[in-house]
Amino acid sequence: PTPCVIIHYPEETINLLPKAIGVKCEQVVCWVYNSNTGKQSRLISWWGCKPDFRKVRQPYKNLNDKRIQKRIAEGKTGAKIYDWWNINQVKNVSKEKTEHPCQIPEEVIGKIIKTTAEENQTIIDVFAGSGTTSKVAYDLGYDTISYEVDKKYCDIINKRIYERGK
């Protein structure tokens, strides 16, 4: 399979990367969240691959709509996800919170993996941080390789991977 690169920070890469390496951005999603700071969104970009939003379903919004009722009766589980994701940040009181200062929510990483990865692919995270990508990849049945230079964060990653099996 063709390598796929997904970048969620910083947003400037969407403008700089095509000029630097000659690859175009295939898809951009806006992840929005409530925050006490001025910044309340991040762009997530796909390079060298295009996500398939049909792989992930979201609940239907208007359950009284006859068309929606018909789809539900046919066994459909929801609409494909949009390119605008409203998902809360990981906060200090979040169940998934670790000691890492800028942790990405499991739901965001899960949507990225589910819409992009093919069966039997290995998920690689070269800035592993809190280990969310590896944890979610394992939870979804994928093998994963993580790289992190800070030993403190390596310990967090190892703990999360070990504890997920309990």
Where are the predicted features?
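Conserved SAM-binding loop
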Residues: 157-158
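Core catalytic lobe of class I
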Residues: 1-147, 151-154
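Class I S-adenosyl-L-methionine-dependent methyltransferase module
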Residues: 162-166
